[in-house]
Amino acid sequence: MKLYNIVFSPTGGTKKVADCLTSALEGEVTTVDLTDSKLDFDSISLTKEDAAVISVPSYGGRVPAVAAERLSQVHGNGARAVLVCVYGNRAYEDTLVELEDAAKQAGFQSIAAVAAVAEHSIARQFAAGRPDSQDAAQLSDFAKQIQHKLSENNLTEPAIPGNRPYKKAGGAGLVPKPTKECVRCGVCAQSCPVQAIDKEDPKKVDDKACISCMRCISVCPHAARKANPVMLSAVSLMLKKVCSERKECELFL
């Protein structure tokens, strides 16, 4: 059995959760980076003997559209899938059911699902430092239960919470822009999952293409990209009430 780590993780939180799970599962791991716009996703083909951990962040309670679109190009061919949604301690709403549908359309059989918490990608004070050691222990335990199901080739589908039709997707509200510290090194443009940043002039941003993933902020070696501080403060204030209380990881088998 080959194990595929199929992950969309612009700021690294989702990948940390995915790695906690895949490192505790059996099989040689092949990583498929759904943020890589240069990758030929149509060339990725699994078999029914394989398993995949498919992980995405929750953006406003939905799967990021670009992640769903790239996953649709992958050929699951009956491979078993563990669905993972990672959220910033607010709520994941319809993310898991949407991911379940996207995985099914790509030819995967969903046998388990996990909802986990990682540091909020925009308001980073919420769920700061997560996944932490407590999460890692919990995810490792989840992986053991998932491995048992994989070893038995148990193909029963988990009961996943969420709504169909899904909630309405929100637009990108925060578009990071360069500060005067920008040296036009181009790291942000190379790393942007949707190529919203001009490669010739990283100070130019396509506001309509941007998905507010905050990848450019997280990869900038000069800390020279920032979100609008007034808007960021408003978002933080709005999230404070719903994000402050610790939420735990969940397993659906």
Model-derived segments and their meaning:
Residues 178, 183-211, 215-232:
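Iron-sulfur cluster-binding cysteine motifs and their immediate structural context
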Residues 2-36, 42-173, 230-236, 241-253:
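FMN-binding flavodoxin-like domain, especially the glycine-rich phosphate-binding loop
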